[in-house]
Amino acid sequence: YTPGSTAGLPISVLGSFAAPPASLRDDADTCRQLVQGAVSGLLTLLGVDADPLSSREHILLSAVLDQRWQQGQDLDLAGLIQAVQEPGMSRIGVMELESFYPAKARFELAMRINNLLAAPGFAAWMEGEPLDAGRLLYTAKGQPRVSVLSIAHLDDAGRMFFVTLLLNAVIAWMR
């Protein structure tokens, strides 16, 4: 498999913001790790150096993803763009949303994500089989299989993005 490329078998990461199963959502630590990993990977791909504790981009995206996942809602990048603009929450922590992250600044973040989605080079990230640890490790008949994931062609940000999403998929599959 070659994520982000059609040189081999492409693998789609668009479903990678799908809500984890209820059993994982009920485990606060695991869910927090999945949210943090997904958001960190996305922000790395966007070129945003984001500390999970101080970056308002990271905090907003984490809050949005956590809220949607706790409701059992899947998100793709298009849904995430909409959720950044209209998060569906009035507060982040104890701060009013508009004080913490004004609408104009949220729009700028939404545009960065949209630019990624609209970029011709990102199209390869949306093609192929969905990123699913179970499907990578077992055939449809339940037979074990070996899957080779080649990331040598990716830049550092692309590698970080994919490895983070892959790790989240494996953790979700294990639990």
List where the protein language model places each region.
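P-loop NTPase motor domains
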Residues: 1-175
